[in-house]
């Protein structure tokens, strides 16, 4: 098998992305990767964080393999404004999204094994007319996927998928449908088999309402939407159960009964995994023809330039991207 590097995008240039990427390289345990970034800015961020880092400027991703063990490979990508750590500027928004597109193109062309995206500052991009709620939706559009993208959060202790992602909580009951639930769960089951090599995955589905609706006495979504979706999927042979009350499905004993938790909305899924293992959790976009992971935290502008940013989630994201790529090859699934 020909080795391929991983492409890492810079994310918000005023955030901690560059610092945690440098720390990931210095950790010396990651598979080969290169950073798409402004070389002068990388040196500046390294100085801010009091990090010494040898850098090798590359012209093509393949050159990563020649220099990675001796220097951090940088594929030059200019930002129009040199912003200070912790102080984002709107004029850099287009360069942030362009770096993501470059990485996706490399992945689609097969010259990189995966992409790992550093956190973006959503309000900055929104002011620049960025039309997507976040990375997940943007990546699906770049890959030409017409189905709703699926976010999976992964740690050693838990795998979890929110059916609805970046939506106001007040909108969730109107967005949630039997079709959406079935579609999301089928994508999740396929990812468990092909990306995580779990041959017969067990799926636990949460309710939407307190106590999973108590048979329709606290809301109607469980009876009208969630239970019919589960029964339909059982008919297809999936090992799936629920709806389970969300307040009882994440205990240590409860987690032994399933391989993945399917939750109805963002915080229902992310609160438990971040509580269990905040700095080692990874965001994965599943259902795409390419492999994409990301550290499961934001830009942390308050930590940018201090040298105090924790790189464990970035390290975990790089390692998991490599693992998923290799699992797909072993399972004969290019996605």
Regions found by a protein language model. Name each.
Residues 138, 151, 160-162, 290-292:
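Conserved hydrophobic/aromatic beta-strand scaffold that supports enzyme active sites
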Residues 147-151, 326-329:
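Residue-level signal for secondary-structure boundary elements
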Residues 127-150:
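Glycine/threonine-rich beta-strand-loop-alpha-helix active-site module
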Residues 77-80, 148-150, 154-160:
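Flexible glycine-/small-residue-enriched beta->alpha junction loops
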Residues 1-135, 175, 179-264, 268-283, ...:
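Contiguous, glycine/small-aliphatic-enriched amphipathic segments in soluble metabolic enzymes
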Residues 153-183:
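Ligand-binding beta-strand-loop-alpha-helix segment within the catalytic cores
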